[in-house]
Amino acid sequence: MSTRGNDPVALCADAVARWHASWLTALGIPWTRDADAWRALAPPHVIYFAAITLRPETPVEAVVGSPGSICDNWQSFDLAPAGYAIFRQEPWFYRPPGPAPGAAPPELELVRVSTEDEVEEFEEVSVRGFENEDAVIEAGTMHPAGVLDDPAMAIFLGRIDGKAVGAAMGYRTEAAVGVFGVTTVASARRRGYATALTRAAMLPETGLPAVLAPSEEGKSLYEKLGFEAVGALTIWTKTST
């Protein structure tokens, strides 16, 4: 496995931190980063982490007390004594550079988002995909159009007959592409749309490896695209007092 001399989980940690920084910048939420961790300086929307470890040796003090959930990328911590509980654990997946075999279903229109209206459409279908098809959200609540100012962020829509049914994001760093937010609405699943969106979000034209943290339901999809597990993360949330 070639990771250009880097720990593959370090590539994952850097990608997720940069993706968070991009969205929080668009949302107007301050953040900071040093060698140990990326941290939000004000509470972000619940879909975002408030702290992300950047190396396995990160001290607990670098993340405890952050204004939201903590992403422990190497599963280095036991934060229970500090009043946290495990919310979820996910594997880190890595795929070497190169195109993925296969083609998008002919009825699927893949759109790379480039306008404010398309960002709003992306946000709407993301909510309908991750929650339910009746879910609604005020524009810009999670994904404001200001993110278009970041050329490293690639956002994709999948449309059928002009209506968005899926979405995905690819975030390019110097060493990898992080794939985030792959979803399709319930009525459009098991038709190859998520696979096509993932292929696009991998940005294979960059010649960079791709990384992501799959849900349990999505593992087999990504394995078929050539991803393999290289580590695991733990998401910690503060317990009620």
Model-identified regions with their sequence ranges:
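Helix-loop element at the rim of GNAT/NAT acetyltransferase active sites that forms part
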Residues: 45, 125-136
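N-terminal charged segments
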Residues: 1-67, 76, 149-150
